[in-house]
């Protein structure tokens, strides 16, 4: 059924568009997810986010053992919009976190994992054997912690070993979260796909810094952090467009998304779902429902019945 005909029928019978979406094997009732790094800390919070319209929640990146992270200051509000953070991947460790979410039966949880070697990921996944996990997101792109994140993602051989180990350890879908590092990020995408990854999240924060002109020193204790929010949206959108143009892989768009218009742009560029984080700092958790409703109204106006009909349309113009 073409779009014009559907639009006319829709106006007559008032069919509500569906915002359910699939990211390969991963099924979501709603396309807007919580990104890793913000609020992904407790089951109570996860339940509240889910009730507020999040299609899934991604946990903070978890390590094999608890990490304290960096001392304050760890976050800086950028003039004109956005944030630079260098929290240092503070987290309670995968074993402790698994015990905390074990009672969950309702919330679609994506567990974010960070490590240096394949054995790290194998060990962490085994901790969740009694948990309801929608997917694992492999953090191959944190820009401000040594020996993990981007340092792993920039090493094709290590990416191959990690993705292979994960796929051999669990039948739960695995997502590679990529970012802009020293090498071409598309090499990370290609390597992950060749190794059997189920989907790609693009992108992580972008390495950045800020300096206090009075003290004449970097503001963050770690000197460098990751830039998130509105300033990186065009970069993230470009990456999603490039990945979807070059590879046949499900994509989750992430980076600077705060409105339904942003979400639709990412769908049109090739993403099947989106994640947001910094927008919560500005709009709190009502942003999920607000974006979902905006997407539905757009779909009604344009005659779309499903998210899938929008995915990648910008590449056909």
Predicted regions and their residues:
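N-terminal capping/small domains of soluble enzymes
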Residues: 1-109, 114
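Hydrophobic faces of well-ordered beta-strands that scaffold small-molecule active sites
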Residues: 32-36, 57-59, 109-113, 136-138, ...
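Glycine-rich beta-to-alpha transition loops that act as phosphate-gripper elements at the mouths
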Residues: 37-39, 112-116, 178-184, 249-261
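Catalytic cores of alpha/beta
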Residues: 44-47, 121-127, 182-195, 245-246, ...
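Glycine-rich phosphate-binding active-site loops on the catalytic face of alpha/beta enzymes
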Residues: 59-64, 140-142, 199-209, 256-257, ...
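C-terminal helical cap(s) of enzyme catalytic domains, especially alpha/beta-barrels
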Residues: 69-80, 211-225, 279-304
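Glycine/Thr-rich beta-alpha phosphate-binding loop at enzyme active sites
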Residues: 82-86, 143-157, 188-245, 249
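Conserved alpha/beta-domain cores
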Residues: 113-170, 178, 186-199, 203, ...
């Amino acid at each position: 059924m073409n779009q014009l005909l559907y639009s006319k029928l829709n106006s007559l019978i008032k069919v509500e568009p569906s915002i359910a979406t699939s990211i390969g094997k991963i099924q979501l009732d709603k396309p807007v997810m919580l990104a890793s790094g913000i609020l992904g800390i407790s089951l109570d919070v996860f339940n509240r986010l889910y009730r507020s319209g999040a299609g899934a929640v991604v946990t903070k990146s978890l390590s094999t053992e608890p990490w304290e992270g960096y001392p304050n200051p760890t976050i800086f509000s950028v003039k004109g919009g956005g944030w630079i953070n260098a929290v240092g991947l503070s987290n309670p460790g995968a074993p402790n976190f698994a015990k905390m979410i074990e009672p969950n039966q309702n919330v679609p949880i994506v567990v974010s994992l960070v490590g240096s070697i394949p054995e790290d990921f194998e060990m962490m996944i085994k901790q969740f054997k009694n948990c309801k996990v929608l997917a694992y997101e492999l953090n191959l792109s944190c820009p401000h912690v040594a020996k993990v994140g981007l340092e792993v993602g920039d090493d094709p051989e290590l990416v191959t070993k990690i993705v292979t180990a994960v796929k051999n350890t669990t039948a739960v879908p695995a997502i590679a979260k990529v970012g802009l590092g020293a090498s071409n990020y598309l090499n990370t995408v290609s390597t992950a796909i060749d190794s059997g990854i189920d989907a790609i999240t693009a992108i992580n924060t972008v390495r950045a810094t800020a300096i206090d002109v009075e003290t004449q020193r970097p503001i963050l204790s770690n000197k460098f952090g990751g830039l998130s929010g509105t300033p990186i949206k065009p970069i993230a959108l470009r990456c999603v467009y490039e990945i979807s143009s070059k590879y046949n892989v499900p994509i989750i768009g992430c980076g600077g998304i705060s409105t339904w218009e942003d979400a639709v742009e990412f769908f049109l560029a090739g993403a099947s779902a989106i994640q947001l984080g910094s927008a919560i700092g500005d709009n709190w958790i009502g942003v999920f429902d607000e974006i979902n409703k905006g997407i539905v109204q757009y779909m009604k106006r344009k005659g779309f019945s499903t998210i899938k009909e929008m995915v990648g349309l910008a590449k056909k113009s």
